[in-house]
Amino acid sequence: MASAQPNSSERAQRIKAYRVAMFTEILNLTPTEAEGFWPIYNIYQEQREAVQKQMRPSNQLDGMNDAEVEEYIKKHFEMRQRELDLEKDLLQKLRKVLPARKIAKLPVAEREFRESLVQKLKDNQEKRAQKRQGAGKNK
């Protein structure tokens, strides 16, 4: 029987399409601006995700000795610096394709997208829970 849940690839594509729609609206991108913006931003996102994957979760700190904690702190700040460097590089590249006002709105678009996505995920979880409860009552 086919699952009602989309696979991770389909889910990623839907999230990407939702990001494009929200950013395009919030930043008020023209077709020409969007054509220049998205390739730059997508590369930035991939690089940023790669940096974030390198960071060890802090919930492992209790099992570390002092030297490992010191190394964790050092690596954590190196990764944060790398993220900052990526963001600076992004802004330099975006200056060639977007006006400053739209670049300045990018953090707003990112925040609103994240908040909206989290809310959509919560709503979907609640709907699934309600369906399960409803299905259980019919048995």
What are these regions (language model features)?
Residues 84-139:
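Amphipathic, charged alpha-helical segments and their helix-to-coil junctions
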Residues 3-5:
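Boundary of Sec targeting at the N-terminus
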Residues 13-14:
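Basic helix-turn-helix/winged-helix DNA-binding cores
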Residues 19-97:
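Amphipathic alpha-helical segments
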